[in-house]
Structure formats: structure tokens, C-alpha cells
Amino acid sequence: TVEDRCSGWAVDRAIRTALGNHPDSPIISLCGDTLGGEAKHLTEALAQGDTLAQDILIGVTRDLAFALSHVTHLFHPQVITLGGGLSLIGGPLRKSIEEQLPGFLMEIYGNGPQIKLAELGEDAVPVGALLL
């Protein structure tokens, strides 16, 4: 599912999987010995130029761009707004999706819809649920 591949938990899992293979990576040192919540360190690791963090981001956003291509083909939105905890990555998340999405779209859709980040960030989900 999208949740399995494109969520904060998916990023946590990817970081834990990489622990043994990349012990010198900045993201590994940022995470320390804590188990859970590793995704919150991705933004800082990206700012430090960590190639492992970049690879993890590209993997997650590739899967998310593929999922959003289906949304685009079915509903033709002009804008897709990303919320939830993963959106806290900010600009790097948005940019990576914008770069990868066109590769999954039929030519007629061009670069696809504009990708925006929800102003509510990780509070988007509970606020949306309360409004139902």
C-alpha cells in the first residue's frame, strides 16, 4: 500500500535497514540508538548532503509519484497537496515528487499537477478527520 511504502514509518524502516551497511552516514549518527521516529532526522541529513538520506528520499518519492500518477490519470487535478508527517520534509519532498511524477504520466498530462505542501503539516490528518 501507499502507507507501507510512502509514510514516515516507511522511511523509519528504510533507515533501520541501512544501519549496518552505512555506519558513517550522517543520518545514522543523527538517529543514534533510538528505535522509531528515525524519519524526523531525514531533513537534517539532507541538509548535510547525506547521500543515503537522498537515496531514501528518492525511493520514497518515486513510489509516491507513481501513486500520484494514478490520481492524476483518474481525476486530472490541477494541484495535489501533501500533508501528514512526511510533508514535514518540506521542499526536498515536493521537489523530488515534481521531478519524478512526469515520468509516470501519459504525455498529454505534461509535468502533471502542481505539488504543494499542506500548511497543517502532520496535523492535516486529524484535523481532516475532525471536520468529517
Residue ranges and their predicted role:
Residues 1-132:
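ATP-binding/phosphotransfer module of carbohydrate and carboxylate kinases, centering on a glycine-rich
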